Structure formats: C-alpha cells, structure tokens
Design a protein with these regions (language model features):
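Gram-negative outer-membrane assembly/targeting C-terminal domains
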Residues: 502-541
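Low-complexity, charge- and small-residue-enriched intrinsically disordered regions
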Residues: 130-135, 413-415, 480-482, 532-541
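Intrinsically disordered, low-complexity linkers and terminal tails enriched in Pro/Gly
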Residues: 127-144
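A short, amphipathic edge element
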Residues: 45-49, 419
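N-terminal type II signal-anchor transmembrane helix
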Residues: 1-44, 517-520
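N-terminal post-signal-peptidase region of extra-cytosolic proteins
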Residues: 84-91
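Small-residue helix/turn framework positions
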Residues: 24, 55, 59-84, 101-124, ...
C-alpha cells in the first residue's frame, strides 16, 4: 500500500508543480496580438486587450482590460470598455503546440455605448462587417467564419443615446447576456436580463442570427420579452417632453426576419400620465397590441391596440413614422358605450380637470378621434357623446342664478347635475381644445348649445345659448323666436362662471326697437326686472 501511496503523492505533487509552473513557463502575452487580431477580424472593429495571465484551473487566459472601437462615423470614444476579458482556451494545444484555440469569451463589467443617428442608424450596425475594419482584408465583406461555444457579458452597463444629443442618455445597469454556440452564419440561443431605468427589470429569451453581414441591427430575432415595473418617464420609449409617466409591465413576443419586426403582447400600466400637466390615473390600463415595424424605413403599422380600463374598451389602429427625432402618428381611436364610472379615474391622466369637488358618475361615453402629426405637435379631431350620466357634487342650476334672475325661475336644487345627453365635435391641439356643435340636455334646466375653447391652462371661453325649460312669452321674442338666452362661460374648468351675454341681449334689444319697441315692451312686461337690467326705465308707479 505504501508504494502506491507514494506514487499517488508524487503524481499529485508533480501536477501541483505543473499547475504552478506552467503559467510562468508560458508567456501568454505573446498571444496578445493573435487575440486582438482574431477579435478585430470577427468584429470588424479595432480591438485592444491589456496584460494577459493564464489560469490552468479555469483553462482561460484573462486580460485586465478590453477596448473595442466605435464606428468613427459616430464617436471617437470606445464602443466597449471592460475591466476584464476572460478567454477560454484549449490547454493541450496551447501548452504543447503553442496554438491558441478559443472556446469561450466572458466580458466582465463592460460599459457599452449604443448611439443612434438622425437617420435611425445604430453605431453597432457595422459590427461584423469586414468592410468597416481597416485592418481586415478589403477584398471581402462576408461575415467571419467564427464560432464560440460560450459568449457571456456579465454586470454590464448599456448607455442608450443619440448623436444629436437632444435627449439625455438612458442607462441600463446590471446587464447580463448569455450566448451559446455563437456563429455569424447560423442561429444561436440568447438569454439576456437587465435592470431598467427607475429600477424595473427586463428579460429576453430567444434566438438570434444569422448575423446580417451588412447591418447587424437587421439580424433576425425570435424572442420572448418580459418587462416588470418599467418606468415610462425614464425609459427611452417616448420623448420626456411629452409628459408620459407611470409604471408598466409587459409580456409578449418579438420576431424579426431582418426586414420586418413583429411585436405582440400585453402591456399593463399603473399610475399612468399622458400629458405634461396631467396627474397619475387612479385605475390600471391594459393594452393588448400587435404591430409591424419596417426596420429600414423606421415606420410601422398598428393593426391592434385594444385599450381596457375596467369594463371600458377602446380600440386604436393606425401607422407611425419614427424617422428623425420626433415620432409622427396617424391613428384612429374608437370607443362605444364605455362605462363612465370606469373612465372617470382616467381623466386626470389626460389633463381633464372637472369643477372642484365634482366627479362624473353613471352613464356611457362613446367617441371617435383621429390623431395626426408629430407627437409634440399632435392634432386630434373627432366627436364625443355621453348619455345618462351625472356630474356629482356640482349644481349647474345654482351657477346659472344670474340667468335665472332674467326669467324669474328659481335655480334648480340638489348637489348634482344630471346629464341626459352631451355631444360635441372636438379638436385637441397644443394651443388648446375647441368644442363645436356642443349640445347638452339637462332635464332640470333645459338644454345648452354653442361652441368654445379650453386653453392649455384650462381657461374657458364659450358662447352658448341656454334653452331653459318653462320659459316663453316675451323672452321667446327677445331670443328671436326661440326660448334661448345667450350665456358666456368663463373662468376655468375647476371653477367655471356663467353670465348672461349682455352684448347679445343688447343686440336683441335694438332689434326690438327696430320693430317699434313692440316686442321689447312685451318682453319687459313678461320678464320681471329685465327692463332695468337692459337699461330701460321703469314706468311711473
């Protein structure tokens, strides 16, 4: 037994000596030019690595620094900078034949800068394109015949920006990417994860490849994508100036043939805000969508976008164009018979401000809105209609007290305003909102028709005619044969004011004088106090 033990001990000792001695006997820095040349040839970019060291136990060569140049059309700064690069090698060929056969690559703690120019071209588009590597042969632009069993990026930082510098770069931390059986000429599995701006998470699991030899960004992809707690304000999905904010979860798929990308899935948003002066919605919003995106043209088609807010359902279809710094859209929003109770908590997100202390209750809302133009100058036109609803906590009758004084009719009581129907044509633009052909029927009061505007600061400027119920006689003649009283609506949406339009009343008074004063005399007799209000002297008592 003892001789066997001694032999084993000697073998172990020799192995230990070899493990310790070989790194000193082999100067792996001699292979640095070969490693740099191999990586530069594969990527089509100049690659530099730092001091090399050999680890027998892990079977790898480690560089204490890695730098990959950017496309000079984008930046003179490195595209990738990393503190460490581990290159897995076959030890036997390296030790006995001094041949460097790479089996796997691990890039640790890299900082990667992703840039997009005004034409939608990315700085990584030329990765792998031999024509972009001055040190490579200029006679061929075909992809390099490179295969790596394992390619990993660990704890990376990706910075997403544009060459114009108009937007603040977006940073994605803790990026991990795992690729197996990588090849430029075939499909390979990819698993990736990242921490999103604002603390959310991203996971991608799928397949990519073969690498497009002309434009890497057009490489085919099939993947499942999951996002959790995406911060819409801090993401790069929309321009921050648009005021979109909230948190979103996404579960869906992404597929691309290198020409057309197709995305489908479900987006669930909470605390959603859609305009700069809006406030977070009190209800979650779910969007089930399908779209197709032309990767070269930077345009797309939204074939489905079903927006659910509680039991309310609206549908969006249309197209978009992402060329340039601002995305333009041409969409149609259609919703029929949507419960107002489910929509009410969404109004703040749209910047809709109701009178202080009030809220919409009951009834249904229908609408059809077409939106056209760049997102920062979007113009939306269409119509809205609401039926059998109520504005709780707001008594319109009491606000019309000045108008009621003309009629001698007491203002309606109660704390709510019941709305039988409300319809209007709508135009929304950055300079404000305009309502035309406004028609509101309120059983306790009558009806209101007219038009007006709401400024970006929510100031009201409406000219309407109040057709108050139970009013006729002389007042009918004053209104030109109808029972309407001209009313000016001012103030703000949170505190509206309603006053008789004295200019219109004066115009009608002049018409009465032109008729010999006959109609005006009848009016002032039938409507107590109206003569004094219009400046007509009362007859001697």
């Amino acid at each position: 037994v003892k001789p066997v033990t001694k032999i084993i001990a000697i073998v172990v000792a020799v192995l230990i000596v070899l493990i310790v001695a070989i790194p000193f006997l082999i100067n792996v820095n001699n292979y640095r030019p070969q490693i740099e040349s191999s990586l530069s040839s594969a990527l089509g970019r100049p690659v530099k690595v730092g001091n090399l060291s050999l680890s027998i136990l892990s079977g790898s060569v480690q560089a204490d620094q890695l730098s990959i140049a950017d496309d000079p059309k984008f930046s003179n700064s490195p595209f990738v900078q990393a503190k460490s690069l581990k290159v897995g090698v076959e030890l036997m060929p390296l030790i006995f034949g001094k041949q460097l056969n790479i089996t796997h690559l691990t890039i640790e703690h890299p900082e990667i800068a992703l840039l997009r120019d005004r034409n939608g071209v990315w700085n990584f588009s030329s990765i792998g394109n031999q024509s972009g590597n001055q040190s490579a042969s200029k006679s061929s632009s075909s992809p390099a015949n490179v295969s790596v069993a394992k390619l990993d990026i660990t704890d990376g930082t990706f910075t997403l920006g544009s060459t114009t510098g108009k937007r603040k770069p977006v940073v994605y931390d803790k990026v991990d990417v795992s690729v197996r059986n990588f090849s430029f000429t075939s499909s390979f599995p990819v698993v990736a994860s990242a921490q999103l701006p604002g603390g959310g998470s991203l996971k991608i699991d799928g397949n990519a490849g073969p690498i497009n030899s002309t434009d890497t960004s057009l490489t085919p992809v099939q993947a499942k994508v999951t996002m959790s707690k995406l911060d819409l304000a801090q993401s790069a999905l929309v321009d921050p100036e648009l005021g979109v904010a909230g948190s979103a979860d996404f579960d869906g798929t992404l597929g691309s043939d290198g020409r057309i990308a197709k995305a489908a899935g479900t987006l669930k948003a909470t605390s959603l805000k859609l305009v700069p002066k809006g406030s977070p919605a009190g209800v979650p919003v779910k969007v089930v969508f399908t779209l197709e995106h032309d990767l070269k043209a930077e345009t797309g088609k939204i074939s489905q976008a079903d927006v659910s807010i509680g039991k309310a359902l609206a549908k969006i279809t249309g197209t978009y164009d992402m060329q340039g710094e601002t995305t333009s859209i041409r969409t149609k929003l259609d919703g029929q018979g949507m419960p107002v109770d489910d929509l009410e908590a969404m109004l703040p997100a749209l910047g809709v401000v109701l009178p202080t202390g009030s809220k919409l209750k009951g009834g249904t809302l229908s609408l059809s809105i077409d939106s056209n133009g760049p997102l920062d100058k979007l113009v939306s036109t269409g119509w809205v209609k609401m039926n059998n609803a109520a504005l709780a906590g707001f008594n319109l009758g009491s606000k019309l007290s000045a108008v009621s004084a003309l009629t001698g009719k007491a203002p309606s009581s109660g704390n709510d305003t019941v709305i039988e129907t409300l319809s209007s044509n709508v135009r929304y633009a950055p300079d404000g909102t305009r309502l035309d052909q406004l028609n509101v029927v309120i059983p306790s009061i009558g009806s209101v028709t007219g038009s007006g505007t709401i400024s970006p600061s929510n100031a009201l400027d409406f000219k309407v005619v109040a057709n108050l119920s139970g009013i006729g006689g002389g007042l009918t003649k004053l209104a030109g044969g109808g029972s309407g009283i001209p009313v000016a609506i001012g103030g703000t949406t949170s505190n509206p004011t309603f006053t008789p339009d004295m200019k219109s009343l004066a115009t009608n008074q002049l018409k009465g004088l032109a008729n010999g004063g006959k109609d005006l005399g009848n009016v002032t007799k039938s409507v107590p106090g109206l003569g004094g209000l219009l400046g007509k002297k009362k007859p001697n008592q």
